[in-house]
Curated annotation (Swiss-Prot):
Any one GO cellular component localisation term in the record: cytosolic large ribosomal subunit
Biological role stated in the UniProt entry: This protein binds specifically to 23S rRNA; its binding is stimulated by other ribosomal proteins, e.g. L4, L17, and L20. It is important during the early stages of 50S assembly. It makes multiple contacts with different domains of the 23S rRNA in the assembled 50S subunit and ribosome. The globular domain of the protein is located near the polypeptide exit tunnel on the outside of the subunit, while an extended beta-hairpin is found that lines the wall of the exit tunnel in the center of the 70S ribosome.
Family as reported in the entry's similarity comment: Belongs to the universal ribosomal protein uL22 family.
Originating organism: Lactobacillus helveticus (strain DPC 4571)
NCBIfam families cross-referenced by the UniProt entry: rplV_bact
Gene: rplV
Name recorded for this polypeptide: Large ribosomal subunit protein uL22
């Protein structure tokens, strides 16, 4: 007999935001209900907030569409940010020198699960 799937996952890979900055936002929503998490993200003035919100909405849509889960019963069971590829650039400086610039990217992952009441 097949086991009932009770979680759904969404990822955004190679997003142009530093992982350190994205983790600040992701830490706010971990363990919260999806309604509360969306409210938090809507009013958090960080560049990563819209990115994480989009991934969360995608995870909710995956849960509803693919696994027939009720969005009212969902919470953010996992949310983490891994480091993606780094774009390496150089900034010209005085006397013919150059300084390196690392444009960091992130892989944002959000997993939503059903509450076991």
């Amino acid at each position: 007999m097949a086991e009932q799937i009770s979680s759904a996952k969404a990822e955004a890979r190679t997003v142009r935001i530093a992982p350190r900055k994205a983790r600040l936002v992701v830490d706010l929503i971990r363990g919260k209900s999806v309604a509360e998490a969306l409210a938090i993200l809507e009013f958090t003035p960080r560049a990563a907030s819209p990115i994480v919100e989009k991934v969360l909405r995608s995870a909710i849509a995956n849960a509803e569409h693919n696994y027939d889960l009720e969005s009212a019963n969902l919470y953010v069971s996992e949310a983490y940010v891994n480091e993606g590829a780094t774009l390496k650039r150089f900034r010209p400086r005085a006397k013919g020198m150059a300084s390196p610039i690392n444009k960091r990217t992130s892989h944002v992952v959000v997993v939503v699960s059903e509450k076991n009441d």
